[in-house]
């Protein structure tokens, strides 16, 4: 009995329509630290979508919110987005190993094809 109710509830939730959370964009600078990450992502996506339109038709509050998210303490210029030398070095080494291995495999494959053709000519 408990399993059927759980399945019904799950189906009911999966068939329901999505309702985005209502957040006042006018207070985005104060509300931003308290918002859940999912809500933050939705606000960012909404503002990106709005900024694709003609900016003359976008309300001033939304323009200010987009500016805050782009240039404020939470955007790409935040302290958490500083360049990390160790991480960058490890990414370079990883990519060199990855693409070096792929290049070596491709070179060996070409050499094997040439060797195979030479062996066919001998027979």
From Swiss-Prot:
List this protein's GO terms for biological process: mitochondrial electron transport, cytochrome c to oxygen
A Gene Ontology term for the protein's cellular component? respiratory chain complex IV
Task: Kindly list the cysteine pairs connected by disulfide bridges.
Answer: none
> What is the extent of the transit peptide?
1-37
In terms of domain of life, where is this protein from?
Eukaryota
InterPro entries in the record = Cyt_c_oxidase_su4_fam (IPR004203), Cyt_c_oxidase_su4_sf (IPR036639)
Q: Which UniProt keywords apply?
A: Mitochondrion, Transit peptide
Has the keyword Ribosomal protein been applied to this entry? no
* Primary location class: mitochondrion
Compartment(s) = Mitochondrion
| One Pfam family linked to the record | COX4
Q: What is the documented function of this protein?
A: May be involved in telomere capping.
Task: Look up the further comments and give them.
Answer: Present with 1170 molecules/cell in log phase SD medium.
> Which protein are we looking at?
Maintenance of telomere capping protein 3, mitochondrial
């Amino acid at each position: 009995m408990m399993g059927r109710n759980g399945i019904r509830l799950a189906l009911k939730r999966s068939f329901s329509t999505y309702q985005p959370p209502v957040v006042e964009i006018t207070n985005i600078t104060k509300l931003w630290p308290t918002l859940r990450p999912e809500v933050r992502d939705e606000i960012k996506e909404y503002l990106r979508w709005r900024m694709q339109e003609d900016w003359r038709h976008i309300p001033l509050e939304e323009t200010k919110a987009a500016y805050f998210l782009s240039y404020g303490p939470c955007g790409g210029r935040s302290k958490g987005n500083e360049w990390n030398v160790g991480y960058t070095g490890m990414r370079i080494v990883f990519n060199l190993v990855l693409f070096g291995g792929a290049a070596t495999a491709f070179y060996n494959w070409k050499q094997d094809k040439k060797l195979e053709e030479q062996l066919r000519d001998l027979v």
